[in-house]
């Protein structure tokens, strides 16, 4: 939300070049010092016992080829591709979509900030549920919240109703798209986790993000409005929610 506010004010004051410059200065002057301060390598010899324990348990699980031949892998991938596709599209086109709904640019920026509020709340809430509910369908309430939010977006016409719609999209989509690592670990273990997770990244980040941005723009140009694009986003969220019913229970014992 703060980034959106800073970006909007910078855009109004100095144009898009000035806004990018402000973001660059903040990245260099704020983010990098925080990284240097908060993230440090442990002292030599620290955590040897813990590292040994991890090494012993890391051998359990599927190999990468075994995971790729599993239906569970492709279900996780498909679910995440759909969720990230919608979220990236809204992040990129959210302000003009809201302006088309009748909001001013300032109101649209404020409403879109609800997306990040929902995403921030979704992560600890989803983590809390994952620790207590041993089923991949634990993400279903979040998926349904995202569907409800997108449907509400289609009919909302006031700043408050659109803020709530965007909040539900952020809460649901953020929770659903934040389960990738956990689901892969539960289905396939830690034996080849890096390779398995890395093989999903090109689809969820490269394909979904670029496709979400491009396709919404293409649909806008063809339809001269975002109406068709919004229905596509609703369909994608709905398909992602339905895919959760096909997820198998976690294996009782990993290979």
Regions found by a protein language model. Name each.
Residues 65-124, 212:
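Extracytoplasmic gate region of multi-pass secondary transporters
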Residues 4-14, 98-99, 129-130, 215-224:
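Interfacial helix-cap and linker-helix signal at transmembrane-aqueous boundaries
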Residues 1, 84, 88, 170-178, ...:
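Small-residue-rich segments within alpha-helical transmembrane domains of MFS-like 12-TM solute carriers
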Residues 112-183:
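C-terminal transmembrane helical hairpin of 12-TM major facilitator-type secondary transporters
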Residues 39-62, 254-255:
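Flexible cytoplasmic inter-helical loops of multi-pass small-molecule transporters
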Residues 23-26, 79, 139-149, 165, ...:
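Residue-level signature of the transmembrane alpha-helical cores
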Residues 187-223:
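A late C-terminal transmembrane helix in Major Facilitator Superfamily
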Residues 18-37, 229-246:
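Symmetry-related core transmembrane helices of the 12-TM Major Facilitator Superfamily/SLC fold
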């Amino acid at each position: 939300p703060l980034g959106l506010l800073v970006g909007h004010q910078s855009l109004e004051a100095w144009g898009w070049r000035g806004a990018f410059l402000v973001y660059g200065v903040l990245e260099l002057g704020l983010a990098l010092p925080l990284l240097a301060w908060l993230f440090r390598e442990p002292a030599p010899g620290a955590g040897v016992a813990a590292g040994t324990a991890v090494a012993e348990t890391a051998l359990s699980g599927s190999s990468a080829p075994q995971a790729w031949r599993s239906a569970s892998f492709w279900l996780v991938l498909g679910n995440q591709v759909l969720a990230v596709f919608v979220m990236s599209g809204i992040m990129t086109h959210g302000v003009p979509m809201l302006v088309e709904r009748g909001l001013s640019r300032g109101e649209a920026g404020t409403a879109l900030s609800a997306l990040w509020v929902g995403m921030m709340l979704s992560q600890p809430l989803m983590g809390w549920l994952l620790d207590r509910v041993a089923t991949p369908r634990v993400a279903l309430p979040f998926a349904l919240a995202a569907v409800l939010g997108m449907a509400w977006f289609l009919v909302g016409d006031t700043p408050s109703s659109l803020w709530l719609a965007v909040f539900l999209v952020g809460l649901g989509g953020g929770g659903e798209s934040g389960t990738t690592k956990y689901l892969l670990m539960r289905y396939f273990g830690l034996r080849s986790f890096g390779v398995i997770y890395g093989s999903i990244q090109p689809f969820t980040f490269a394909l979904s993000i670029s496709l979400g941005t491009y396709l919404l723009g293409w649909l806008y140009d063809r339809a001269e409005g975002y109406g068709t694009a919004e229905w596509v986003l609703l369909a994608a969220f709905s398909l992602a929610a339905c895919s959760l019913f096909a997820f198998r229970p976690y294996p009782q014992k990993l290979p």
